[in-house]
């Protein structure tokens, strides 16, 4: 279950003893916080029971070629998370990026040991387009085989889901789960 950071402790208590993991989002949904804020928010969420971290990348920094900012946030968040046995999903917002920027985001994710690259926050009303099969295929081609790819954003049907899996997605994020499963 993925929740906002302020609910990490409550979710961890409610789910204690179950197989359901607590995931929390960091710098959601825009990713514009400074690296030190993201690192602190991550450490706090982990201390309160989060087992997975969904970090929204600073897209503005990436697009402005301020890779030092992205490096700093990734280094700190991955170190804090892996130190507690948690995985990190980096949300890169592919609908806002060029192909070259997607490639660069994947390079930075690999450099810092991100576990899963995620296409989007899914806030598609704010984005110029939804996640595409081509986005997933490009990410899959640019990350190591053991790095996961999570497709999210605009996935509403069984056909959408199967196309994303065929393109290389190892996880799907969708709010239409019941409809997707019903179509199988």
What is the role of each PLM region?
Residues 6-149, 157-184:
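Alpha/beta enzyme core
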């Amino acid at each position: 279950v993925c929740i906002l950071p302020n609910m990490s402790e409550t979710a961890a208590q409610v789910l204690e003893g179950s197989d359901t993991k607590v995931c929390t989002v960091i710098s959601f949904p825009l990713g514009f916080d400074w690296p030190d804020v993201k690192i602190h928010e991550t450490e706090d969420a982990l201390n309160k029971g989060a087992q997975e971290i969904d970090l929204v990348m600073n897209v503005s920094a990436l697009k402005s070629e301020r890779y030092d900012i992205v490096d700093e946030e990734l280094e700190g968040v991955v170190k804090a998370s892996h130190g507690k046995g948690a995985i990190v999903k980096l949300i890169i917002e592919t609908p806002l990026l060029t192909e070259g920027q997607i490639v660069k985001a994947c390079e930075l994710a690999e450099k810092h040991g991100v576990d899963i690259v995620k296409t989007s926050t899914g806030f598609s009303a704010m984005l110029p387009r939804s996640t595409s099969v081509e986005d997933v295929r490009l990410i899959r081609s640019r990350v190591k085989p053991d790095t996961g790819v999570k497709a999210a954003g605009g996935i509403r049907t069984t056909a959408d889901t199967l196309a994303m899996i065929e393109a290389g997605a190892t996880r799907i994020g969708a709010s239409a789960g019941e409809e997707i499963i019903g179509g199988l």
